[in-house]
Amino acid sequence: MPNWLSLAEQVMEGYELADEEALAILDCPDDELLLLLQGAYRIRSVYYGNKVKLNMIMNAKSGLCPENCGYCSQSAVATAPVKTYKMLDKETLLRGAEEAYRLQIGTYCIVASGRGPSDKEVDIVVSAVKEIKERFGLKVCACLGLLKPEQAARLKEAGVDRYNHNINTSKQHHPNITTSHTYDDRVRTVETVKEAGLSPCSGVIIGMKETKQDIVDMARSLRELDADSIPVNFLHAIDGTPLAGTNELNPRYCLKVLALFRYMNPTKEIRIAGGREVNLRSLQPLGLYAANSIFVGDYLTTLGQEKSADYKMLEDLGFEIEFSPAPQIGVV
């Protein structure tokens, strides 16, 4: 069997996994899983110690999306009963930021449905972010869809720290998930974000009938894109979406996926994102031996577990919350 600790040491010296080594992680026998996670934790602990970054989503605009993404309950092809509303106002976004501050959330994520933001929607986000930075000093991540260079520049100027735009899957599998935009459209937005000086956040959704080679390709593509933060979502197959009833993930495989992303992107923030609770289930704590970041609270159209359960999990693991806000005028 592979010596996972030895491989971890090689990775930290700059070694990049070959495809066969990456696939071996996904094919790791269950009786070696803890050894695999030991290697992943060796990497994680060198770069992040025992700290965990907390993130919280504000669903700033829900539904009403013209795209045809097969996984999404907000898409034009979904029949799932989701709330639909236009962009929230500044005051509502500020109330969400205040809650995030009270919960020791390091990154407040403003997420809006749709192909891409209108200039008016960017205006609202810009206005809110300026005040969020002044009052709470939180890091802010925006996720508004495909982005124009001038919009990216405005977000950067307002104080947005990070922009999320997931590649979601591999380039070869992308047409099986959506045809209303291309994989290259997504990559172009990540590049636009980087050019504007924003920290790029880009991740994946696992469980959409992709192959193991697809997953390896995703991890490698994100390394090549140099994404600072990589959210790993596990499909929560919602009734009324084209992918409903297709999820065949199990908790052990999800842990192997998280380990793969750590071995292939050793220095990056790896976040256990959507679908954590329903796919990792009782093995959620083990995921943090590979990942160093989670979402707290609810997702866009699905519920997370009770916030208190997340904080108790971190306490039981002996991990510390990374929280260092820098408000400019103090919390009021």
UniProtKB/Swiss-Prot annotation:
[4Fe-4S] cluster binds at C65, C69, C72. Keywords: 2Fe-2S, 4Fe-4S, Biotin biosynthesis, Iron, Iron-sulfur, Metal-binding, S-adenosyl-L-methionine, Transferase. GO terms for biological process: biotin biosynthetic process. It is an enzyme of class 2 (transferase). Pfam families: BATS, Radical_SAM. The keyword Signal does not apply. Residues 47-273 form the Radical SAM core domain. It comes from the Bacteria. Pathway: Cofactor biosynthesis; biotin biosynthesis; biotin from 7,8-diaminononanoate: step 2/2. GO terms for molecular function: 2 iron, 2 sulfur cluster binding; 4 iron, 4 sulfur cluster binding; biotin synthase activity; iron ion binding. Its EC number is 2.8.1.6. The keyword Transcription does not apply. Its cofactor is [4Fe-4S] cluster; [2Fe-2S] cluster. [2Fe-2S] cluster binds at C109, C141, C201, R271. Catalyzes the conversion of dethiobiotin (DTB) to biotin by the insertion of a sulfur atom into dethiobiotin via a radical-based mechanism. Homodimer. Belongs to the radical SAM superfamily. Biotin synthase family. This is Biotin synthase. It comes from Geobacillus thermodenitrificans (strain NG80-2). The gene is bioB.
